[in-house]
Amino acid sequence: MGAMMVMMGLLLIIVSLCSALLRWNQMRYTKNGLPPGTMGWPIFGETTEFLKQGPNFMRNQRLRYGSFFKSHLLGCPTLISMDSEVNRYILKNESKGLVPGYPQSMLDILGTCNMAAVHGSSHRLMRGSLLSLISSTMMRDHILPKVDHFMRSYLDQWNELEVIDIQDKTKHMAFLSSLTQIAGNLRKPFVEEFKTAFFKLVVGTLSVPIDLPGTNYRCGIQARNNIDRLLRELMQERRDSGETFTDMLGYLMKKEGNRYPLTDEEIRDQVVTILYSGYETVSTTSMMALKYLHDHPKALQELRAEHLAFRERKRQDEPLGLEDVKSMKFTRAVIYETSRLATIVNGVLRKTTRDLEINGYLIPKGWRIYVYTREINYDANLYEDPLIFNPWRWMKKSLESQNSCFVFGGGTRLCPGKELGIVEISSFLHYFVTRYRWEEIGGDELMVFPRVFAPKGFHLRISPY
């Protein structure tokens, strides 16, 4: 009996302490002018609920507090905005005290010169450097020929397979395609070591920044260190060779006639930026496009007809040209609709550099603002039957330029690699739908937050078309 009373007493003390901590943390962020909302626990905030409940957490908070509310996510006090007009203002006004505000784990792992982290003149330098690598001329003469050759050879390897994990295949496809464009003709051991480190880096970028052994954050930092070592060795090897290279790394290292000269650290961060920014969007969009096309035979029929028409006009092994890809109107519509419905990217983060008034509220300096676009993608006022896969809605080009369209970012941070990603996904779909039929094995769980991900893989049975 005595032991029971002690246990009850301890439990009461713990509950009281937890309640006091929650109240104390809430009071810390209760200031005049702040939006409504809850802040959760000290340090951790509401990160656990956010990551576990995902869209349901956001939806419930929106119902309680409206489209502009406060929380504490990934180690920082954060304002969440689901208002399309407010989002447009936030994304277009970087010069007015709003700069990129990505989680500390992402900044630490992707590098201080990463284009998503810098602003002002540094951002213009890194963005200009990237855009020079993916200009229309570069796309036509260098990038697309490499992408086309890679996709054909990569999908050739599936001829003898009956069942594939399309999640695994598209992740490797996206990584290897980007790495081929950055630095071609790499030795296999180098590629394998780089790939292992890169996959660990990706996991670490969305983690609580606690540097302890075994944490995703520590693994991500170690993976980035390994990637830096590999890139240093590769760059030194190229300098020692005296050869001229026409891949992305070659242009980044070029000194003469380079309008955007970068330091070695900036080059390494640029390489990681290119790999990271395209990896998840290209791989996941490719996987989800196949799922939606499988579930909507009419859309698959129209997409396949578009691609078979190109093949009929070409010799058997003739590659796709840039004008071919630009002419794939329905394919582009499928890519946009897949990105919208699957919500490959849930939103973007900004940070205030001074106290700001937004939407009638006073936002303190140093707070992050999460422009959360998932709910906007499903807004019935913006998209008719928003939960239905309907690529035909995008055949009206004007939809891409609407203020409510955040599929590829917006404002001054509109994704600079958007067209490169579309080229890669279009090429993949071209060679897949003209070579294979497929059906889902079934039974695979598909998570949609914080990343679109199948924990045990997403399996397809394929056969020649």
UniProtKB/Swiss-Prot annotation:
Task: Report the principal subcellular site.
Answer: membrane
Membrane spanning residue stretches: 2-22
Membrane-topology descriptor: Single-pass membrane protein
Sorted alphabetically, the Gene Ontology cellular component annotations on this record are: membrane
- UniProt cross-references to Gene3D superfamilies, sorted A to Z: Cytochrome P450 (1.10.630.10)
Cofactor(s) this protein cannot do without: heme
Its UniProt pathway annotation is: Plant hormone biosynthesis; brassinosteroid biosynthesis
Q: Which reaction does it catalyse?
A: 6-deoxoteasterone + reduced [NADPH--hemoprotein reductase] + O2 = 6alpha-hydroxyteasterone + oxidized [NADPH--hemoprotein reductase] + H2O + H(+); 6alpha-hydroxytyphasterol + reduced [NADPH--hemoprotein reductase] + O2 = teasterone + oxidized [NADPH--hemoprotein reductase] + 2 H2O + H(+); 3-dehydro-6-deoxoteasterone + reduced [NADPH--hemoprotein reductase] + O2 = 3-dehydro-6alpha-hydroxyteasterone + oxidized [NADPH--hemoprotein reductase] + H2O + H(+); 3-dehydro-6alpha-hydroxyteasterone + reduced [NADPH--hemoprotein reductase] + O2 = 3-dehydroteasterone + oxidized [NADPH--hemoprotein reductase] + 2 H2O + H(+)
Its tissue distribution reads:
Mainly expressed in apical shoots, hypocotyls, siliques and roots. Also present in the female gametophyte.
Induction per UniProt is: Repressed by brassinolide (BL) treatment. Induced rapidly and transiently in seedlings hooks but fades out of hypocotyls after exposure to light.
EC number assigned by the record:
1.14.14.179
Q: Where in the cell is it found?
A: Membrane
**GO process terms (BP):** brassinosteroid biosynthetic process; brassinosteroid homeostasis; megagametogenesis; response to light stimulus
Spell out the family assignment given in the record's similarity comment.
Belongs to the cytochrome P450 family.
Record's function text:
Catalyzes the C6-oxidation step in brassinosteroids biosynthesis. Converts 6-deoxocastasterone (6-deoxoCS) to castasterone (CS). May also convert 6-deoxoteasterone (6-deoxoTE) to teasterone (TE), 3-dehydro-6-deoxoteasterone (6-deoxo3DT, 6-deoxo-3-DHT) to 3-dehydroteasterone (3DT, 3-DHT), and 6-deoxotyphasterol (6-deoxoTY) to typhasterol (TY). Required for the initiation of female gametogenesis (megagametogenesis).
Name of the protein described by the UniProt record: Cytochrome P450 85A1
UniProt source species: Arabidopsis thaliana
